[in-house]
Amino acid sequence: MDSRVFWASLFDQLELKRGERVIHVGAGAGYYSAILAAIVGPAGRVIALEIDNGLARRASENLAAWPQASVVAADGFAYSAGEPADAIVVNAGVTLIAPAWLDSMAENGRLLVPLTNANWQGAFLLIARRGGAYPVRFASWTGIIPCIGGRDAEAEARLADAMARADFTAIQSLRRPPEAPDDTCWLAGEGWWLSTATAEGAEP
């Protein structure tokens, strides 16, 4: 599938609205950040995060025509937005879900994130925030470049084990402390775990 068609299908699932605030992790040279900026319009905002300084400079130049988009040369995994985001789009494969992303989600916010193994294969999950609940929906299978800062060997091994036990489509919710992992746990990370049980809240 053409990558532009693939990303268009993912952006459709986010159901972005005019005026919304989006954080784009792994912006590269800014192509998809520009599309996000066009979708949210002049009243919206896109914060494009890129860890590579050279790519961040190119993205700034390429996004000059979209004043609602700004580029930050930073590690998107550790970045704290400081204000809630309506949508967070992660453009590289991770083995870990950053607690900072979850903390940055506004009420009814959405997080689109690819969990991938050592071979860069995995799936995009669409995580929503509904009060204290985080319903999760499978969005797409993927093969995508790894996210610098969003992976470690131990988490990669845990993810590989989870993928061998059950399909991504079994995941129904994300849970956070003080709720402890139980027998519905698909994968656990620091400050979060994925469950095959439905969330107490609306569907994502």
Regions flagged by a language model, labelled:
Residues 3, 62, 97, 182, ...:
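Acidic, low-complexity intrinsically disordered regions
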Residues 119-204:
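SAM/dcSAM-binding transferase cores
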